[in-house]
């Protein structure tokens, strides 16, 4: 509140939440949607996306023929992959922080990250290459700015889609 211009409209309320996801979003004849399937964080609108993606996936994979064990396994694998990519994007914001004014921010900067995110960070550090996977919610234009590094080779990174136009000017 120290940086707030003017008086606060009300006292801030602490809202506690637990992050995570179900191991099986589709289990037997039940498919969890929304907050019953998992929760990542309150600042991005990822929950809305995950609901829409879950419903779309279920419509595409609905077991009209009766059997559903293989479909449920595939549904769960795709859902888990989607949760993990979104998780990586959120963790990246904390991991790459330049803040070190509190133990919280130092712990974020020093934390161990999932292998999938560690690879993404290493590739970007080494080459300035940022990418969007086929099923990633966040595009290159979202990943690249978060992955910025002061005086880094990544400054020469050209966002996908702009390369053709740039090549035409050379």
Model region roles, listed by residue range:
Residues 1-97:
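FAD/FMN-dependent oxidoreductases across multiple families
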Residues 60-170:
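Long, low-complexity C-terminal extensions of enzymes
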């Amino acid at each position: 509140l120290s940086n707030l211009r003017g008086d606060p409209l009300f006292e801030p309320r602490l809202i506690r939440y637990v992050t995570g996801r179900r191991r099986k979003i589709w289990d037997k004849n039940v498919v969890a949607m929304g907050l019953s399937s998992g929760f990542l964080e309150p600042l991005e609108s990822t929950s809305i996306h995950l609901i829409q993606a879950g419903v779309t996936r279920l419509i595409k994979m609905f077991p009209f023929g009766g059997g559903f064990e293989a479909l449920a396994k595939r549904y769960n694998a795709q859902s888990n992959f989607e949760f993990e990519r979104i998780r990586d994007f959120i963790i990246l914001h904390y991991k790459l922080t330049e803040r070190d004014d509190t133990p919280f921010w130092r712990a974020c900067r020093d934390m161990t990250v999932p292998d999938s995110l560690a690879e993404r960070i290493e590739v970007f550090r080494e080459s300035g290459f940022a990418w969007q996977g086929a099923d990633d919610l966040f595009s290159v234009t979202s990943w690249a700015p978060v992955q910025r590094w002061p005086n880094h080779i990544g400054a020469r990174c050209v966002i996908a889609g702009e390369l053709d136009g740039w090549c035409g000017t050379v």
